[in-house]
């Protein structure tokens, strides 16, 4: 892992992502997670190209749920080495809950998979908010940030209105409404968070885009036509959200940092 992590730090530096404090485990785990997300995206794309448009893309292999969840699991492992203890305590469960949601949404044969997957991601968003909220309180927001928050709230309300007539059929009115509120709160908190880079904010918007496509596919189209772009947007979301936390920052003197190996 040491050689992978060293190579990862060099790659990140060449990409212009500074790593002033990133331990080897963190940088290496983040890069390996990115490769896992890329690999699953390619796998999903190949399946989609072999099937008629709108076909179900999950349930094609016994290990597909584990494959899908591997990116978030690896990001959680990387987050264990995050030097800022308060953020680490929120990020690790957020990513493990995301992995749980990935797993559940990859087992379509279970009737309750969507509802429990929704619940797992709802809790993940609350954990992300826990990590982001102190960063959003550090200074008065700029007009641009406020405008982005307003746009996010308007878009979320519009989606809920669009989905609303279709939610009662599966008794999902309350769960989906609560989820959209939590997702919107997470994205708005990310847009307001004071971080050295824009990656976390961009990642949060990608998360909203991914979940919006899930809702459109399930409640409007009634098929899996958007499954491939959903994954790519979601993978970008998790990678970018964590990049904003992990890289380009200085460690506060009072941070409880795990030892680097």
Curated annotation (Swiss-Prot):
Record's GO cellular component terms: membrane; plasma membrane
GO biological process: lipid metabolic process
InterPro entries in alphabetical order: TMEM86B-like
Noted pH dependence of activity: Optimum pH is 6.6-7.2.
EC number(s) recorded for this UniProt protein: 3.3.2.2
Lipid bilayer topology: Multi-pass membrane protein
Protein name per UniProt: Lysoplasmalogenase
Pfam families found in the cross-reference section: YhhN (PF07947)
Family annotation (PANTHER family): GH04784P
Naturally occurring in which organism (per UniProt): Mycobacterium tuberculosis (strain ATCC 25618 / H37Rv)
Function comment: Specifically hydrolyzes the vinyl ether bond of lysoplasmenylcholine (pLPC) and lysoplasmenylethanolamine (pLPE) to release a fatty aldehyde and glycerophospho-choline or glycerophospho-ethanolamine. The cleavage activity is specific for lysoplasmalogen substrates, and there is no activity on 1-alkenyl-sn-2-acyl-glycerophospho-ethanolamine or 1-alkenyl-sn-2-acyl-glycerophospho-choline (plasmalogen) substrates. Confers a growth advantage for mycobacteria in host macrophages, possibly by cleaving toxic host pLPC into potentially energy-producing products.
